Design a protein with these regions (language model features):
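N-terminal, polar/charged subdomain of small-to-medium soluble alpha/beta proteins
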Residues: 1-122
């Protein structure tokens, strides 16, 4: 049986945050880039915002979670996904990646990143 799948996403959301395992990272902070993608079966194509994922809400979730200092980026991603599926229970799949620009390590590293995905058991 064929069905439509819809994607609503944010790419390259730039944030400054205090995430990091080392105490100095939580003092100095760093620049981060977030990508957030949701996928779901659309309920209808009737031009109603209530029947889709509002990317403004996704941005609010990302901005709010980036303000909550965490040691591990994985924790930030898990919190973002949890809020997305709580707000939009019809979402089948969520993927979030979080890049830390210029991570504090020897050498020249453009960014490190962590990616986490959730798939509904529906």
């Amino acid at each position: 049986m064929s069905q439509f799948k819809q994607t609503v996403a944010l790419k390259d959301v730039k944030c400054f945050a205090l995430h990091g395992y080392y105490p100095e990272e939580q003092l100095i902070g760093n620049h981060f880039v977030v990508d957030l993608e949701t996928e779901f079966t659309p309920q209808a194509f009737d031009d109603q915002l209530a029947k889709t994922v509002n990317y403004e809400h996704l941005n609010t979730i990302v901005q709010d979670e980036m303000k909550n200092t965490q040691k591990l980026l994985e924790t930030v991603l898990n919190n973002i996904i949890s809020k997305v599926i709580a707000l939009y229970p019809f979402v089948d799949h969520v993927t979030v990646s979080l890049k830390k620009l210029n991570p504090p390590m020897p050498g020249q590293v453009g960014h490190s990143f962590v990616k986490l995905s959730y798939t509904s058991a529906k």
